[in-house]
Amino acid sequence: MKKRRKILKFKKHMDKVLNRPSTQEPYYTNMHGINSWYDHYNAMLFDNKLPYFDEIKIKRIHGALGQVVYTTYKTKERMYVLEMLPKYPTKKMFLETLVHEMIHLYQMKIKNNTGNHNKLFYSFKNKLNFLGLELSR
């Protein structure tokens, strides 16, 4: 019951955030925003089991809103890098992109899955819809 209350409280918070007039204005990505929202989503969606990205880059990306890039070294250890755009048309788009990439990290690092847009990926769709966010490709 405690977790349910926590989720409902977070939903109320998300509703407030998404209904602010400033949410429809361009959002400039910053490390504080990424880390703060990462912690919120990690607690609500992943029970704080999702590790942090090894590195976070704010950069221009062609043909994508964000991406998780991984490199494998000789030790077979993978490094996961989150790449986000410097500017998004709206804050909602930033939030949806961040949680989208977090799901990919969850697939690859926790579930040892491919990280594709598959059944595991789309299993988060209802949770995000409940919070007022969309999960898309």
Give residue spans per PLM region.
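Active-site-proximal or metal-binding-adjacent scaffold patches in catalytic folds
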Residues: 1-96, 105-137
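Walker B catalytic acidic pair
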Residues: 101
